[in-house]
Design a protein with these regions (language model features):
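A mature extracytoplasmic/lumenal domain signature
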Residues: 107-109, 132, 150
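Charge-rich, low-complexity N-terminal segments
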Residues: 2, 16-82
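Mature extracytoplasmic domains of secretory-pathway proteins
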Residues: 68-123
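C-terminal partner/receptor-binding element of secreted or periplasmic proteins
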Residues: 141-160
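Generic hydrophobic, helix-prone segments enriched in Leu/Val/Ile
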Residues: 54-57, 91, 130
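Short acidic, glycine/tyrosine-flanked loop/strand segments centered on an H-E-D-like triad
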Residues: 122-147
Length: 160
C-alpha cells in the first residue's frame, strides 16, 4: 500500500498541473467579449481570460490597451503606444501556485518611414508584460516591454 501512495505522490508532484508556470488564452471578440462602453473613437470590452480572471480591452483613436484580472477602474490610466497599434489575440499568463501574476501580450506597432507613411516592413512588434489584478490588489499595469524584432529570445526575456 505504501508503495502505491509513494508512487501516487511522486506522480502528482511531477504532473504538469503542479509544475506549470504558464498557460495561454485567446481574446475572442465574437464569442467571449462584452462591450461595456462605446464612444465616438473607440470601445471598452470585458473578455474571458484565464479561469475567472477577465481581460479588459480598450481602443481609442486606433490605439489599443489591454488590462488583466480584477480591476476596480476600467479606464483609470491609459497605457498604449503613441503610434497606431493593435494587440495580438494570444495571451500568455504567468502562473505561481496556479494563480496568474503576469500576462504577456504581443502588440503590433505601425511605424512610419521617413516620409511619415506607414510601411509594413517598418511594423514593430513588442511583447508587453503586465501585472494581473486580484481581489486583494485590484490594479493592472505595464511592467515591461521587450522588442520582439530586436531580440532573438524575446519570449524568454519577457518571462524573466
Amino acid at each position: 500500500m505504501w508503495q502505491r501512495v509513494i508512487f501516487l505522490s511522486f506522480f502528482l508532484a511531477t504532473s504538469p498541473a503542479f509544475s506549470q508556470t504558464n498557460t495561454y488564452t485567446k481574446i475572442d471578440f465574437e464569442n467571449t467579449c462584452t462591450i461595456v462602453e462605446e464612444h465616438e473613437i473607440g470601445i471598452t470590452a470585458i473578455c474571458a481570460g484565464y479561469t475567472g480572471y477577465p481581460v479588459i480591452f480598450a481602443e481609442g483613436d486606433l490605439r489599443q490597451m489591454v488590462r488583466f484580472g480584477h480591476i476596480t477602474k476600467l479606464g483609470d490610466q491609459w497605457e498604449s503606444f503613441g503610434q497606431f497599434n493593435r494587440a495580438g489575440d494570444t495571451i500568455e499568463w504567468r502562473l505561481k501556485d496556479k494563480k496568474p501574476y503576469a500576462a504577456i501580450l504581443r502588440y503590433f506597432i505601425e511605424n512610419s518611414n521617413s516620409d511619415g507613411e506607414y510601411k509594413k516592413e517598418f511594423e514593430g512588434q513588442v511583447l508587453v508584460v503586465s501585472t494581473v489584478g486580484t481581489h486583494e490588489k485590484p490594479t493592472s499595469c505595464v511592467v515591461g516591454y521587450v522588442d520582439a524584432r530586436a531580440n532573438k529570445n524575446a519570449n524568454n526575456l519577457s518571462q524573466e
